Amino acid sequence: MTEKRYLKWYNKVGYGSGDIAGNVVYAFLSSFVMIYLTNTVGLNPGIVGTLIAVSKLLDGVTDIFFGSLIDKTHSKMGKARPWMLYGYIGCAITLVAIFAIPTNLGQFAQYAWFLIAYTLLNAVFYTANNIAYSALTALITKNSAEQVEMGSWRFMFAFATSLLIQSITLGAVTALGGGAAGWRTVAIIYAIIGLLVNTLSVFSVKELPEGELVDTTNKKEIEQDEKYNLVQAAKLLAGNKYYMMICVTYILQQIYGAMISMGTYYATYILGNQNLFGVFSWAVNIPLIIALVFTPTLVAKWNGMYKLNVMSYTLATISRALVAVAGYMGSGNVTLMLLFTAIAALGQGPWQGDMNAAIAACSEYTWLTKHKRVDGTMYSCTSLGVKLGGGLGTAITGWLLAASHFDSALAVQPESCISMLKIMYLVIPFALDAIITFILSRMKVEEANEKLRAAA
């Protein structure tokens, strides 16, 4: 029996474009906040890393809090769309604030400014926006194939935006005056673009009626499904092993991304050409986009996500090992590094494309086992993963830079720093890919749901 389809092509494209807005924030922040703070503002990378880690203490609570709020929201726009729309206004304001730290402030005030703006962006506004955006996967369609297609469109836009930002930002900062003024102007431009695209994405889709989502029109039954407090929500999530697997995987992916962002330092201080960071960005993002184009077809051909995810990430792990080998062979092996980087990205693509569908399957698992609809709360793993993983990754890079005696005033870094940059950019990404591959080999949520439905 063919599943009912709910979406037109323009709904999928409109939804996917929302990650242009998300990556205007995330790609810009994760790729450039550390080098902006150390080389332009003059802050200590170790202290910055510690402040980011302190900020992350709030994230786990706010993720579950906003996910629960979304589940309990009833409005003309639906459950998630209001949070996606209004949350981004705060994202735009705080993004500009982070890249507009006054240079005439005392250093203590600069650290405080960064901590407040960074915490508001991540723990409040980005949380509300991103959880709502991700939850729409389960709120605008019940068709699993469409959910995979939505994920593919979403991450095609995400990686294209990331590629563009990583490729043009340093040049744009220089063209717009350089220094603090250049960074501030670029942040304002990105924030305006993100605000416009996010608004268009919100109004490109409509949520399904709540009765259709839970297969009942009984309002009391719907309300009963939503009766749980914050502690109960946390227990529902913790009791779903597949949610925990996805959450850990998401966090590891974002730490991986933070390490890859060290390419700005690697290209500058080891390869001797900061513009090579943009070339490596192409080697990462173009293969990811190509993989995403074919992900829905491959999922359908292989009757599910499991085999595709495990096999493709195994390829990614092997390729990252070869990137490390080429990197340690010397700076003359840039071509080999680019080749294996591209193959690794190709292997990572399918999981990026079907991840949201996997989360929807996790939500279905909770419904089948606990009889609670927790779509918004379930998608908290996307926001939690991005913020906790990305923040922790950025904090770790700051600590490691400080521990290796990085000095932004030096054109040539000490050998301790060069060795650490190689570990961060070559070794750690390989290790993270290996761990993710192992977790994906255990993530048999589709099979579990089929058994539960058969037993019902």
Tell where the protein language model's regions lie, with residue ranges.
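Membrane-embedded alpha-helical bundles of multi-pass transporters/translocases
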Residues: 2-456
